[in-house]
């Protein structure tokens, strides 16, 4: 029986889906798994390569090639289901333009900034790279070198990068692209609870009475989680779904309470709901009195723009953005009382002809939170986080759950959804941000630096105390010539970063700078670099991701990378061999540990008795491990166990390394072999003391903070010259910049190019028809696309939406590089543009 690969994928996926639904498939489908040809495949588990949901997949390998994938029925997250991107996982590694050897810009046999990309050996690539890094460190010091990493790094890669940059090069100029997606969530968690990441888990979905989406199109961005929400809504008819967004999208199809609002006005609506809860006497007084305190945050904090920007200069408190002062409950109640229904509607309603309907929906939404009998899960993603007041928005959604006590119990959860597969596990938990260390530690805290130096066996004072350049600032410093040696891994910031014409591309092509990009395909970012390093991806290496519900998942290396491609982990560790401590550390630091003199950073960081303590025999003999073979010890296990020591006993407990290869992921803290589903609640969280009920132990007093924060306008709004709001985002078929999904023929054909979604009346007013080519123009740049007046996304009048997956249509030429001043996360959801027919 011969079965085509396409038919096999389709039928096995159908079988997995059917088994979850309790459906029996025809014999032809069921018999596939017993076919002789198919039994030659080796199946192994792995988490999906795409979003932060953390779906489990089964991966089939034959002849050192991934030939099929299907949803893993044993995975708790997705229960055998895949979205359309996960369905085509087997194809993402095999694009025709896969990078397989290092490429250096050269002219006449030498490196030249303006030369052509030329194939070179790894030795030649690292020779040039090391020379450039050493030159910069010698001339300008460690603050002139930097790295931009990723929420797609494995846990091991991110941890190795933290050690290399913050300890080896003594530079905190390390930031992940998670700065663009999750920094506001992190800052919100830390300000309210003193600890990062959600207190709930996906198990909330099956017992909640209401779901509220704030700036989250789960139907397309988290479709597997949306299937669970949909199942709950349809199987429990009393369940309600509210969807709030600046435009109508596919998630609205399930909405009982649909609300389209004016950009930035979510701040006002959040305060209105808090006011509604208080005025209707629905505050959970016992919970609030025992477990919360109230603070008022500093206002008028600016927008993270360059200091000479007039809007930034006008801010009164740009130098104390995170400050706050204690207030009472009565003072908080008075503060939010301004946000009554009329005032909030005036700020938030984009369609004045539907004012009555808007008010009705807003009241229904407020009642979901206020009614003590209704268990509520709030979801949000980029609508909250990519926001010039993103940290505030996160704090304010917690206000609603804390005022009502709807938190940390099954079905009651404020749930920040993650965009990348390991934005939680790597960027946040490992601490690859410019101000962080592992397990919520920060470089500004002397005790935290001391702890890290102790674990890493380094001399006191190795880790700098000043935070480094964050993502947006890195681009500005590259342009200004203050950041000169720069390594980019697992991201495509030239397509993703805002205002790229003015603040991105100039820095990459600055003659004083040497830019290295490690990637699997020739992305926009790679083509702007001076050296391209070919990387292994996904199951071409052993890895670990941490998903949105604190679930850490491992996988084995299943196939070899093509050609000379090497994992980012191998690149980081191998590169460290080219630096002796004398070349990167001052003499007074070496004098504190003279036994390190003459050693390489590889010796100091990765052969320190911790990382190299697990021998090759610990590697599972059924699987290859390229890094273990290269370095002679089980590198991943050593890195993980050293990293895990930061969090064990501190509320971030991870299980022993080997447990993860056996399980379909475990949710931390894992104490005495048991994972934690709900944090901060007695009886569920082992860190909560008996008799306390709840304990928000990230804060010294064990209490969560309810913040009084106002509505503040965005830095740029539509006017006569630029009359439209621009919002950017993703679509179901593509992930981030499309560098993987656009190389899958089926996904490319499903949505080949980006378009400008526009209200039909706006299009008619401009004399535009569907399919007409236009320019989207802002004060910073312009790009060409085509108008779409139908389909899945339906903006209100006055707003356009353009997805950013298309490398041929760089919408980030247009966007504004304003940030939340607290989280330093970019606001990609609002700026002013005009639309002009070509």
From Swiss-Prot:
One GO cellular component term: membrane
SUPFAM superfamilies: ADC-like, Formate dehydrogenase/DMSO reductase, domains 1-3
A Gene Ontology molecular function term of the record: molybdopterin cofactor binding
PROSITE patterns cross-referenced by the UniProt entry: 4FE4S_MOW_BIS_MGD, MOLYBDOPTERIN_PROK_1, TAT
Keyword Cytoplasm found: no
Disulphides: none
Post-translational modification comment from the UniProt entry: Predicted to be exported by the Tat system. The position of the signal peptide cleavage has not been experimentally proven.
Residues noted as binding Mo-bis(molybdopterin guanine dinucleotide) in the record, renumbered to the chain: 85, 152, 177, 181, 214-221, 245-249, 382, 386, 492, 518-519, 541, 568, 728-737, 812, 829
Free-text comment on the cofactor: Binds 1 [4Fe-4S] cluster.
Signal peptide: 1-29
Compartment(s) of residence: Periplasm
Binding, [4Fe-4S] cluster: 48, 51, 55, 83
Catalytic activities: 2 Fe(II)-[cytochrome] + nitrate + 2 H(+) = 2 Fe(III)-[cytochrome] + nitrite + H2O
EC number from the UniProt entry: 1.9.6.1
Family to which the UniProt record says this protein belongs: Belongs to the prokaryotic molybdopterin-containing oxidoreductase family. NasA/NapA/NarB subfamily.
Protein name per UniProt: Periplasmic nitrate reductase
